[in-house]
């Protein structure tokens, strides 16, 4: 009797955030080879619903994490759609349910990492979603004319003259790498994982 060779699970780490990471994770889930996916998500988003929640509640940015969780979710279509549902009127206008859910979990647990793990359990994700840092950071840029821009959204959607080139970028404060993200990256390198860096 011929022995059936079991396919080796390919382990892939995706580093990025926003729509780009969601698209890559969604595509990889449809890949014919068995995969274990780990998303290491950027934490500098400051626009839209995420920016408002950061300003009002002092939480870490939930939006990019939410997208990665939904991309890896094995929950029902209704639950996945619920997490992406965006309110259209009144005080909650433009907020997504998933962003509010993650904000509430962070306030309850006092730890964004714990909030992400609990949301991952609720959404029954197939893989891992890890914030790259647990520090409350902002992306900053110095322009060629010497002016300083703070906040990712102010860089992406400039209020300044967009023809002025960016001279350098940095994080404020200097971010500490989440130990779980470091562990995943080192394990990936050791095991010969494939790492994909997504420009979000």
Language model segments and positions:
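Short secondary-structure boundary segments
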Residues: 1-6, 80-84
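Conserved catalytic alpha/beta core of Sir2/sirtuin-type deacylases, generalized to analogous enzyme cores
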Residues: 2-12, 19-29, 35-39, 102-200
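Short glycine/serine/threonine-biased micro-segments
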Residues: 14-16, 96
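Short, glycine/charged-enriched secondary-structure capping and boundary segments
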Residues: 27-31, 53-56
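Glycine-rich nucleotide/cofactor/substrate-binding loop typically near the N-terminus or early
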Residues: 38-110, 118-123, 128
């Amino acid at each position: 009797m011929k022995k059936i060779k079991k396919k080796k699970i390919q382990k892939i780490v995706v580093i990025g955030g926003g729509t780009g990471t969601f698209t890559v994770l969604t595509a990889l889930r449809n890949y014919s080879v068995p995969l274990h996916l780990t998303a290491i998500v950027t934490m500098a988003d400051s626009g839209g619903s995420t920016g408002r929640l950061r300003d009002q509640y002092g939480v870490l940015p939930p939006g990019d994490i939410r997208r990665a969780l939904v991309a890896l979710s094995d929950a029902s279509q209704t639950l996945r759609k619920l997490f992406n549902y965006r309110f259209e009127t009144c005080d909650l206008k433009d907020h997504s349910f998933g962003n509010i859910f993650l904000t509430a979990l962070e306030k309850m647990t006092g730890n964004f990492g714990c909030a992400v793990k609990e949301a991952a359990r609720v959404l029954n994700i197939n893989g891992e979603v890890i914030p790259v840092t647990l520090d409350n950071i902002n992306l900053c840029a110095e322009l060629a004319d010497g002016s300083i821009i703070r906040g990712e959204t102010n860089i992406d959607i400039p209020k300044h003259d967009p023809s002025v080139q960016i001279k350098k970028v940095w994080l404020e404060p200097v971010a500490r790498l989440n130990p779980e993200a470091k562990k995943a990256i080192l394990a990936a390198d050791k095991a010969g994982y494939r790492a994909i860096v997504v420009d979000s």
